[in-house]
Amino acid sequence: MGVDIRHNKDRKVRRKEPKSQDIYLRLLVKLYRFLARRTNSTFNQVVLKRLFMSRTNRPPLSLSRMIRKMKLPGREGKTAVVVGTITDDVRVQEVPKLKVCALRVSSRARSRILKAGGKILTFDQLALDSPKGCGTVLLSGPRKGREVYRHFGKAPGTPHSHTKPYVRSKGRKFERARGRRASRGYKN
């Protein structure tokens, strides 16, 4: 008897469809699957891939970040495309005229964009508007903005580590002595 082949690493782990059963998302997937196949544009392939992603991999994009990214040279008059949610940012005083396409736009962000004379498209409208993604800028929110990422990395307590430890309380007696002050062993 020979040693059999290990089949545990055969499967390529990647999404081929969204996990969600949302019928409207599924319709968009149908549309962009067609466009990705029939057009030779990478834009449609990227949008399709992002439609499959989980919520944590489609972080919300704030209005301020979008304005900042759209102010960069060569992006005037282009459509900002976000496969995710656009949220409002109260720190922004004036909103420029923007043309935006997103899966969702929060109510306050929506009213502010429209008030500034901007335009909000859905992805099916974008497919009619620019089927190859011409004149668009693909944007996404900060994926590592979630608090949980602060706990990842080098173990807390090791030299040069800025990783946040999981502590039940932030009091004086919790992870504040050895390794945090020179009088208690060492400080790093």
Swiss-Prot record:
InterPro entries: Ribosomal_eL18, Ribosomal_eL18/eL18-A/B/_CS, Ribosomal_uL15/eL18, Ribosomal_uL15/eL18_sf. It is found in: Cytoplasm, Cytosol; Cytoplasm; Rough endoplasmic reticulum. Its main location: cytoplasm. Gene3D superfamilies: 3.100.10.10. One of its GO terms (molecular function) is RNA binding. The keyword Transmembrane does not apply. Residues 150-188 are annotated as: Disordered. Residues 161-171, 178-188 have a biased composition (Basic residues). GO terms for cellular component: cytosolic large ribosomal subunit; rough endoplasmic reticulum. The modification Phosphoserine is found at S130. Component of the large ribosomal subunit. The ribosome is a large ribonucleoprotein complex responsible for the synthesis of proteins in the cell. Component of the large ribosomal subunit. Belongs to the eukaryotic ribosomal protein eL18 family. This is Large ribosomal subunit protein eL18.
